[in-house]
Amino acid sequence: MMMSNLKLGVDVIGAHNLFPKDGQGTSNAYVELYFDGQKHRTTIKDRDLNPVWNESFFFNISDPSRLHYLNLEAQAYSHNRSTNGRSFLGKVSLSGTSFVPHSDAVVLHFPMERRGIFSRVRGELGLKVYITDEASLKSSAASNDHPDNLDPALPRAMNVEHRSDKRHVFYNLPNSAQEHQHQHPQGPNQSSSLAAEQDNHNEHHHHYVPKHQVDEMRSEPARPSKLVHAHSIASAQPADFALKETSPHLGGGRVVGGRVIHKDKTATSTYDLVERMYFLYVRVVKARELPIMDITGSVDPFVEVRVGNYKGITRHFEKRQHPEWNQVFAFAKERMQASVLEVVVKDKDLLKDDYVGFVRFDINDVPLRVPPDSPLAPQWYRLEDKKGEKIKGELMLAVWIGTQADEAFSDAWHSDAAMPVDCSPAISAVLRSKVYHAPRLWYVRVNVIEAQDLIPTDKTRFPDVYVKAQLGNQVMKTRPCQARTLGAVWNEDFLFVVAEPFEDHLVLTVEDRVAPGKDEIVGRTYIPLNTVEKRADDHMIHARWYNLERPVIVDVDQLKREKFSMRIHLRVCLEGGYHVLDESTHYSSDLRPSARPLWRQPIGVLELGILNAVGLHPMKTREGRGTSDTFCVGKYGQKWVRTRTMVDNLCPKYNEQYTWEVFDPATVLTVGVFDNGQLGEKGNRDVKIGKIRIRLSTLETGRIYTHSYPLLVLHPTGVKKMGELHMAVRFTCISFANMLYQYSKPLLPKMHYVRPFSVMQQDMLRHQAVNIVAARLGRAEPPLRKEIIEFMSDTDSHLWSMRKSKANFFRMMTVFSGVIAVGKWFSDICSWRNPITTVLVHVLFLMLVCLPELILPTMFLYMFLIGLWNYRFRPRYPPHMNTKISQAEAVHPDELDEEFDTFPTTRNPDMVRLRYDRLRSVAGRIQTVIGDLATQGERFQALLSWRDPRATAIFVILCFIAAIVFFITPIQIVVALAGFFTMRHPRFRHRLPSVPVNFFRRLPARTDSML
């Protein structure tokens, strides 16, 4: 057997800020690499704490199937030439799950790790680790030694022998965004080696590869839905808008209290979050030797599949006796009223289609097939005429009964999603379910430094030049700079958003502002993005000079006279250490950086079952009655899912299940319901019906949440309930320790804190990211249109709304309500409203003053007990949109009209003037509050500023006296006296302000300096 060509490449770039080990403040550093029993080492860099190697090494991978379980270890040492010994400088360990292909690899600087408790290490090691399968590359074992740098005491690279009796299979690296595909369970055509690998590591992947099995389901009446109310009275809302807990019968059994009651303990199913639905599948593959039907000597065949009143039609071919369709039709068994399936071959004609032949099946004899059973092999069937006699021509078909777990489900034509009038392939395409993968987004940073040897068209004046950078439809410009020496300096940064694969070019144009409104192009350069360097941290990118090309052809003699060409100095890189925000930061579903090597292992699996919808409002009129053609869209991370469109149905049943990998619990799943606008006239927009958000950190792991979610939408006339969506959600944890560790990590990648963006930059980049995702998903089939992407991504969440401002104010008041309640309680204590309570507080206060070491233990013990007590009343349901918190119940109609106004406004001037005056009134109150806060702060500053010499003198003298008193008097006595004085009896109080308050209010502020 031949060995696999798969190799692990390691580029040792350099190290930074190493620990000195030679006693003279330096180190003789080198690096040893260990992987899969192989060992390589770099050259020795003498007397250098920041060595640079730029050396590449390649390791043979003996068994690619075990790649994820191997580790790469890089150990740095300092060589002592006097003793032929070595000192440990630090190590870096990388797991096999972080290895990526060469195209995705970037240079990462890893902090040095200790080998033991007493190891003294510091600094970073720069590595670039990747996987390649180029056969021309050889292992570095034979060529890695450097005789001039090796010392006899140092070990050389070891040659590793590989057994040739073991079969090696090449494995493509898995894409984490594709490990859980919608409704495509593993078929029997997978390689035996992969099956063996799954068997060997079943305990690590039991969440990913469950088995399919058919089990019977009783049609018992479902339990009545149970209303779920919030535990807070302040956030209570109408019962019609509340969440309803349900106990449906799903594929795995009945759900009661978030747990599944299995009827058959041995029965398991991947699709256990939806009701099992049975379909009659008909795969029309091809036909042969069809009889001639036209006078032209040919036939224009198409196939019509009929079950009772349901009919599916394939596309037709012109003049072909051996057509191939390979189309699948799915008929919902619960709606079938016939017992016979007819597959009819017809000849397309202008007036009336001609009858060619048919094949008839008894549905009771159709076999049942559920994955992981092998796909049913199609067979040839002889056509019959209307009399039942065999005729010339055969049709290849496969007919079986399956569930929504079948591989053919997503691409099939569905009877419950069929148009009553138009059943063309184009219409059928926009009705199917689909899984989309959004492109991986990157930030492109362009640093425009300077330009030299600029040659303007008018040499009688100094050019006033600026640089225009363009990437797709994103355009940015530098400030104008007057080039007095035929050179200009800007040193400005631009940021763009780009999606993989990098097909666009970065275009930089140097333009001369000849006159106001008139610019002339001086030079231009094109930079392909696939040649731009990627970086995952903030290390410096080397700047490069790029030649500027003239936009027009000039005189050849002039080109010969010009000795130098125009150049521009740029620093361009792809930022992989950031997460490109393409959705609202409050509802982010993915927080991973762009660079794949920085991704951590998934901590869990999110499963979503979209069951059905009830009580939907009609969104259109068809044949004189209201109806809807609805579908659902789910978004989490880079994976978008779309259910099939249920045509002409106000209570549709979807029963489709989807799965996502979870990398961070502080993320949000978003599910939207839409009305398909592509079934009528072209150019119609898909209409939004409602949206649901579920934050994963609020879910208990392993629990199945089955609820009916109200679809609440805010209209210009007020909040409306558009129906209810019944869903089942389960969050399964793979590694509980990793999930808890995730709570200690920053929410966003490191670069967001090292080199943060401004708020304006974030809004602009987010807008560009949404446009890129919408353009990419809009090219899929069926497309996810732009209005869907914008609605799911909350692109308008930053726009002004009086309703949202009120809601945020009351939210803030709710947050501080506890502090206000404590202040009110303490005021009652000080006023001796309840003497017994006040005396007890005095005793407790005296105990804490005498024993201050009990303050922190008492406080934390109190919070511990309160937390245990509240566990009994913990929420048992996912949070949902609350109309009372959103201030959507009693909102003024004019405020709603303002919220739905476009940007810029399209309302009449009188309405805009009225709203402007109202906004001025609100802003005036805010201005007053901010001014009062500033005044209090300036009075504190005036205590020691001698702005009021008498007040400052009094304060300084009091501070000196207080210092003497606090030095002489024990602090317990001072605190006790202050506490007793604060809680003194009302008989010893008066209503006038105290002396310190009077003194503070007399201090000057800068209000006198305001215009």
From Swiss-Prot:
It is a multi-pass membrane protein. Ca(2+) 1 binds at D294, D300, D347, D349. The keyword Glycosyltransferase applies. InterPro entries: C2_dom, C2_domain_sf, C2B_MCTP_PRT_plant, C2C_MCTP_PRT_plant, C2D_MCTP_PRT_plant, MCTP_C, QUIRKY-like. Ca(2+) 2 binds at D294, D347, D349, D354. The chain crosses the membrane at residues 812-832, 846-866, 954-974. The keyword Transmembrane helix applies. Coiled coil: none annotated. Keywords: Calcium, Endosome, Glycosyltransferase, Membrane, Metal-binding, Oxidoreductase, Repeat, Transferase, Transmembrane, Transmembrane helix. SUPFAM superfamilies: C2 domain (Calcium/lipid-binding domain, CaLB) (SSF49562). Its main location: membrane. Its cofactor is Ca(2+). Residues 178-201 are annotated as: Disordered. One of its GO terms (cellular component) is endosome membrane. Residues 178-195 have a biased composition (Polar residues). Pfam families: C2, PRT_C. GO terms for molecular function: glycosyltransferase activity; metal ion binding; oxidoreductase activity. CDD domains: C2A_MCTP_PRT_plant, C2B_MCTP_PRT_plant, C2C_MCTP_PRT_plant, C2D_MCTP_PRT_plant. Accumulates specifically in hydathodes. Restricted the basal meristem of roots. Observed in flowers. It is found in: Membrane; Vesicle; Endosome membrane. Belongs to the MCTP family. May function as a signaling molecule by regulating the trafficking of other regulators. This is Multiple C2 domain and transmembrane region protein 7. It comes from Arabidopsis thaliana.
